[in-house]
């Protein structure tokens, strides 16, 4: 969730993609985090030829290269309501897509806008007396841009069929000898980043074992591709131009943890009751472990007032000059729920 929210791509990479023999030990895989296209590496051969695949060929090649297009929103608009401004707060307005969706009409006239209403991470006091951070547009602007970049990524990609064996997801290559690209495109437009790979490999088994396997596949109603019968191996790639910004899919409503009601222990600065003028308390969530919080002086697992920000306490009745408060005491267990299912907005419902 955090990597999606911060536009960080991730992939599992091989430390050594090719082993010289079956006796060579396999090295550990690497988790790569990439937040900029410039950090994607080129494959070792760098260039791949668009050509037929044949046993007589010296090098593997790409045999089919087809553009895939889909209609996406031409503009992204994000907004949210903030109490301290008493208005609907917008980002920098609708962000128009940089992708050209029509040869006859511009993006503005198409009016395919996608609008989002985002729940804020906090609701501040109208008088600004609760120490809450002032609302701003920076987060909305970032989300607006990220959603727009993802829609542009989905607008056009390419499907390639190849016999290239040493090709890896998260690497880029230059496609050569493609008639359309050679005629009408610059060298930068011939560089493609691999986002997805499906592959087919044929086992090199003795004939009797192969016949038994084929019978088992038939009995299991599994189907093998007729196009692959004459090939020992093949793969299908999803690629985009290297110049297109790559961001992970992020849906603010879907890609977030499910927040359930849970318990927490009341923490204080040493007093029996520790609240601010708003009746808010501080708590330690029961799932926290000391080892996980040593990097920040133990905050979160110290059993004192450094364990959380101020947390609102629900009361039976409240207002200016009337109402009632029942203040939780040190080390008592309270029940925590979350506004709008947002883990950043906890509140105490009772004890």
Positions of PLM-derived features:
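Amphipathic alpha-helical and helix-coil boundary elements used as assembly
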Residues: 1-351
């Amino acid at each position: 969730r955090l990597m999606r929210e911060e536009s960080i791509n991730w992939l599992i990479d091989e430390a050594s993609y090719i082993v010289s023999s079956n006796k060579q030990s396999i090295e550990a895989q690497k988790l790569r985090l990439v937040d900029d296209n410039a950090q994607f590496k080129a494959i070792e051969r760098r260039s791949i030829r668009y050509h037929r695949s044949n046993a007589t060929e010296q090098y593997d090649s790409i045999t089919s290269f087809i553009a895939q297009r889909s209609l996406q929103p031409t503009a992204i608009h994000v907004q949210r309501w903030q109490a301290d401004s008493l208005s609907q707060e917008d980002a920098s307005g609708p962000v128009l897509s940089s992708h050209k969706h029509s040869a006859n009409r511009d993006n503005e006239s198409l009016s395919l806008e996608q609008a989002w209403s985002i729940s804020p991470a906090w609701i501040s006091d109208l008088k600004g007396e609760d120490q809450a951070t002032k609302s701003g547009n920076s987060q909305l602007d970032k989300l607006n841009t990220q959603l727009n970049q993802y829609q542009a990524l989905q607008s056009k990609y390419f499907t390639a069929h190849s016999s290239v064996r040493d090709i890896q997801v998260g690497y880029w290559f230059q496609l050569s000898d493609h008639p359309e690209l050679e005629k009408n495109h610059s060298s930068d437009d011939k560089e493609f980043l691999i986002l997805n790979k499906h592959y087919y490999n044929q086992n090199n088994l003795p004939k009797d074992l192969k016949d038994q396997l084929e019978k088992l596949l038939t009995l299991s109603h599994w189907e093998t591709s007729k196009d692959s019968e004459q090939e020992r191996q093949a793969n299908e790639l999803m690629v985009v131009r290297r110049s297109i910004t790559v961001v992970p899919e992020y849906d603010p409503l879907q890609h977030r943890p499910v927040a359930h009601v849970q318990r927490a222990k009341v923490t204080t600065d040493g007093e029996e009751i520790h609240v601010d003028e708003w009746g808010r308390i501080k708590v330690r969530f029961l799932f926290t472990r000391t080892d996980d919080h040593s990097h920040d002086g133990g905050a979160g697992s110290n059993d004192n007032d450094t364990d959380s920000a101020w947390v609102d306490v629900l009361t039976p009745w409240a207002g200016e000059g009337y109402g009632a408060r029942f203040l939780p005491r040190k080390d008592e267990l309270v029940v925590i729920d979350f506004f709008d299912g947002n883990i950043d907005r906890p509140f105490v419902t009772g004890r």
